[in-house]
Design a protein with these regions (language model features):
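Conserved N-terminal phosphate-binding loop of PLP-dependent enzymes in the Aspartate aminotransferase
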Residues: 1-183
């Protein structure tokens, strides 16, 4: 955990005891489109970060909420970030849970299942326009380097896990098994 990730976490129990976190982070209630629009209309919100399937409680906001949220993000120039740490990599019958809602986020965070649970590994995917703003020049290309990045074992585990997901059609299997559970 980082103070940045804690600052955008909606669970106050996780934040207790960590002191000052990033200022200006506001949580809005799930499925409350009016609360979201109120915050975004201030035009000082960099990003709307959401879990399609919330890790705590396995709750999913409505399809209408997500469609309206995406439109509001476009309207107010706010980035839409899908936190797929727990629900991504085929766990819901699609590569990413946001696909069930027809969403097209600007940024996607992935971890946990990315290595099949073998080693810690995470990734971030983003639009080319975001990449160009962050890493547009040679002096910016290593602006966010890290000590443990590009770990060979983690990357190998990630590639192997993705190969198994594809070769054994586990995403499709998760979808069909999920439909059986609904019946």
């Amino acid at each position: 955990l980082t103070t940045g990730s804690l600052a955008v976490n909606g669970n106050d129990e996780f934040k207790d005891g960590f002191g000052d976190l990033l200022p200006g982070c506001t949580a809005v209630p799930s499925d409350d489109i009016m609360a979201l629009e109120y915050e975004l209309s201030k035009k000082d919100v960099a990003a709307f970060i959401f879990e399609t399937v919330q890790g705590k409680g396995v709750y999913s906001p409505s399809r209408e909420y997500f469609a309206q949220a995406q439109e509001l993000c476009k309207k107010y120039g706010t980035l839409m970030i899908a936190d797929e740490i727990q629900s991504g990599m085929g766990r819901t019958g699609r590569w990413f849970a946001f696909e069930h809602f027809g969403l097209s986020p600007d940024i996607v965070t992935i971890a946990k299942a990315l290595s099949g649970g073998f080693v810690p590994v995470g990734a971030i995917c983003y639009r080319e326009s975001i990449y160009n703003k962050v890493f547009s020049k040679m002096d910016r290309c290593v602006v966010h380097s890290n000590t443990f990045g590009r770990n060979t074992l983690a990357m190998t585990a990630g590639i192997a896990a993705m190969s198994v997901l594809e070769d054994e059609k586990l995403v499709e299997n998760a979808e069909s098994r999920g439909l059986e559970l609904y019946e």
